[in-house]
């Protein structure tokens, strides 16, 4: 960093090299595009590259303006694996959306969240492509299995889970839980080890 000069000896470098990780875990939700005025001096930046983000006109966005870019995940997987030659683990990936609780033809409450199914399907297809590219991937987990308060916006209406929780931003709701359509879809993806994905 600017103004700091740390002397690192060869012995220090050896100790650091011996302390390498066994794998790299990371979260992936979106890609970002920045304009040409991005700050080169990080010490003058207030929000990293986000302060210069621009919309990518070639891809869709979520209700919260997050780019939906499955191919970006494949790119990131290949880039990280090529750079570090360590197994990778996707610890978070998912779509925050406004879900509508409905009653189906059998009288069961549910959410027809085809948008979430499409998002996850398309990202998992790209994960499979990255594995075919030679990326060593240890695992994949979605964010999250049940609706909860969004860490990025502090909202309950931004829902990620396979299970709907009847709770609203204003605190109303019964806290009852209902399986969304994506619940059984993802259960099938797991049972078939990805064989049920649509390419």
Task: List the predicted regions and their residue ranges.
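Non-catalytic scaffold segments within catalytic domains of secreted glycoside hydrolases
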Residues: 1-199
